[in-house]
Amino acid sequence: MKIVADENIPFVNELFEPIGEILLRPGREITPADVKNADILLVRSVTPVNAALLEGSKVQFVGTCTIGTDHLDKAYLDERDIAYSSAPGCNAGGVVQYALSAMAVLGLLQDSPSKDFKVAVVGCGNVGSRVYRTLSALGYDCIGVDPFLDTSTIPHLQPFEAIYDCDLICCHTPLTRSGPAPTEHMFNTDVFNHLKSGATLLNAGRGGVIDNRALLQYLNTHNDLTVVLDVWESEPDILVELLDAVALGSTHIAGYSYEGRINGSLMIHRALIDYLLAHGEHPEDTRRAIEAYVAKDKETINVTSFADAVLATYDVRDDDALLRQAVQGLPASFDMLRKQYRKRREFSHYQIEAAPPKLMPLLQSLGYGVVAK
């Protein structure tokens, strides 16, 4: 069995070598010639999977180690009877960490949030709902915006226009161009003009959900909107002038925690195992060894405030600085920063040795451990 895989998929050899012969390629450079004789294709969001790539190939299973699937031509895959699977929610913990870090840097993360501070989470799927639940549990007044859900899933569900009264808007939607509620350029000049003065807009979903040129034009003529962008239109060839105009920018790494990336690999491995079992194969399952390896090490920290606890695990300013320093090398440096991304650990990796007692329940609810006395 032949497998073509993105070289940046964590533990790709350890997980998939027992299943078949692996050819590793840079994600943006996977070609029809690479996949012509492959049975399995494993990708990330940087690889468009469509007729141009797969026509004439033997591929029968496509796995993407990402939550999003807008890079997969699902209609073509269905027509060709090619099975496919994604990793919904795999990086939710990392995205929560990213959002809280940005809030801490901007002075929006408080031990006791003001009741006058209102948050909107736009897109409440696997990741957005985790952000919504986390901020709500931390005491923030949160609303959810998602036309495909009802209040049984998100209690305070509101129409899109409700974001105009919010102080922080966190965007976690997929990119869609058709259907009953397309998200492409959902945030445009008209929306910017209606946002609350002094609001903060954070996008860790898909770049095209925000009209980047319209946003740049707005920021060049207004000083009442703070913007945090982890995702951009036309990645990796991003609008450099927009980077100059936003408060914080990064290279599509919000969910790029060590645990999140490994979760994506493990979920696709499980999906492939299930597919092969259903087709009479009996592949070796190596997930347990990987899971045990990830879980065994912990790091101890001391904190004095909630913001301090978050920034001790991850400071988004580090990634912002790396992107700004690499701006002359764009677009290649955008991908290089992602490829060489450090081992960023989620809250569950850390154990609190000392912290104000009132913070301990809050920190434990986020997954921090506590050093036994």
Swiss-Prot record:
Active site, UniProt feature: 206, 235, 252 (proton donor)
A biological process term (GO) from this entry: 'de novo' pyridoxal 5'-phosphate biosynthetic process
Keyword tRNA-binding: no
Catalytic reactions of this protein: 4-phospho-D-erythronate + NAD(+) = (R)-3-hydroxy-2-oxo-4-phosphooxybutanoate + NADH + H(+)
EC annotation from Swiss-Prot or TrEMBL: 1.1.1.290
Biological pathway: Cofactor biosynthesis; pyridoxine 5'-phosphate biosynthesis; pyridoxine 5'-phosphate from D-erythrose 4-phosphate: step 2/5
Enzyme class label: oxidoreductase
Entry's localization field: Cytoplasm
Principal cellular location given in the protein's record: cytoplasm
Molecular function terms, GO-annotated: 4-phosphoerythronate dehydrogenase activity; NAD binding; protein dimerization activity
Function in brief: Catalyzes the oxidation of erythronate-4-phosphate to 3-hydroxy-2-oxo-4-phosphonooxybutanoate.
Record PANTHER family: FORMATE DEHYDROGENASE 1 (PTHR42938:SF9)
Similarity-based family: Belongs to the D-isomer specific 2-hydroxyacid dehydrogenase family. PdxB subfamily.
Protein name, per record: Erythronate-4-phosphate dehydrogenase
